């Protein structure tokens, strides 16, 4: 359960909590099931773009856990300047500092690129080793850690068409209060809206009907990044597990809702496959079944949200009663 990884930057933040304390990091995954994405001018649904920023995560990481996230990457400066800053941070890193950098995973063939994206912007953590020519790479999202050649890592930063980086100095990690956790849940919870599913549906319809300048052939590129976005839905499992710890409901019930989450994730894989097939074969007759599948996925996710909100309210009431008893 604790090994679910769904978002590279959030996973880095949670890994720091996990390695430096016994504090529960799972609330930080709240709302990630509806995480930001972008649709480019060409109609590509993208998990990363210059239009997406992570300010929300930085703000709430400090609110919940008391740790300030410092953005060292300056988008106003050129790549060489930012690489120089990165080098200084790594080479002068105190023991309690975590240096997070965005690499292009497609430039690291030694590492598995399971989503087959190129470029593949991805956040992970870097530190020095006893060997000058090797760095230690900690990649929580892919559950990978080990030594890499320093020059290869630098190349994956330098030649990354995107860029980004943060550092966190860990002094003390605070345990979020139940009130803070509740505030974060409420802040991120979109009860009636599954934006990714609906935007994907609208885009596929437009491309199939070749509306607004779109072409059916554009669907292949349009849905390529869907698997990277789909795994964010696994963050529901973190939330269910977190509330179950207090509510103590059966494992059978927990598994039922995890299976519904899996239905959605696999549904995205199914839709991606069918959309690509429709584009490759020019068979617009497939559109109806694709739309029906997306509507089915939307209905399942709304059921998940209804149940999750019910559990949240029960959890909140129990926590409120606990605090009254303590008082």
Swiss-Prot record:
Transmembrane segments: none annotated. Its EC number is 2.3.2.-. Disulfide bonds: none annotated. Disruption phenotype: The deletion mutant cannot produce petrobactin on iron-depleted medium. In vitro analysis show that mutants grow to a very limited extent as vegetative cells in iron-depleted medium but are not able to outgrow from spores under the same culture conditions. InterPro entries: DUF6005 (IPR046047). It is an enzyme of class 2 (transferase). It catalyses: N(8)-citryl-spermidine + 3,4-dihydroxybenzoyl-[aryl-carrier protein] = N(1)-(3,4-dihydroxybenzoyl)-N(8)-citryl-spermidine + holo-[aryl-carrier protein] + H(+); N(8),N'(8)-citryl-bis(spermidine) + 3,4-dihydroxybenzoyl-[aryl-carrier protein] = N(1)-(3,4-dihydroxybenzoyl)-N(8),N'(8)-citryl-bis(spermidine) + holo-[aryl-carrier protein] + H(+); N(1)-(3,4-dihydroxybenzoyl)-N(8),N'(8)-citryl-bis(spermidine) + 3,4-dihydroxybenzoyl-[aryl-carrier protein] = petrobactin + holo-[aryl-carrier protein] + H(+). Signal peptide: none annotated. Keywords: Acyltransferase, Transferase. Pathway: Siderophore biosynthesis; petrobactin biosynthesis. GO terms for molecular function: acyltransferase activity. Involved in the biosynthesis of petrobactin, a catecholate siderophore that functions in both iron acquisition and virulence. Transfers the activated 3,4-dihydroxybenzoate (3,4-DHBA) moiety from 3,4-DHBA-loaded AsbD to different receipient molecules, including N-citryl-spermidine, N8,N'8-citryl-bis(spermidine) and N1-(3,4-dihydroxybenzoyl)-N8,N'8-citryl-bis(spermidine). Also catalyzes the transfer of the activated 3,4-DHBA moiety from 3,4-DHBA-loaded AsbD to spermidine to generate DHB-spermidine (DHB-SP). This is Petrobactin synthase. It comes from Bacillus anthracis.
